[in-house]
């Protein structure tokens, strides 16, 4: 049997985050894509806020504010900046 790769979370954007994506240029989208790949592979990687399950992940001039679901199968992205 072949070795299965780890399950990755599905990324879903709130409307506000989707609008922010539409305003980004190609370089910003490329940086954001790398950050989202990291979050999808490990939804718990971001720093948890003091107020619940909201997490923030920052890397390479990218900031993503998101909420991972309890089972880690879905990541709800609320805010992005690059």
State where each predicted segment sits.
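Enriched for short, Lys/Arg-rich terminal
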Residues: 1-11, 19-34, 38, 58-82
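PIN/NYN-family metal-dependent endoribonuclease catalytic core
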Residues: 14
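Major-groove DNA-recognition helix of helix-turn-helix-type DNA-binding domains
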Residues: 42-45
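Short, hydrophobic/aromatic-rich segments at coil-to-beta transitions
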Residues: 49-56
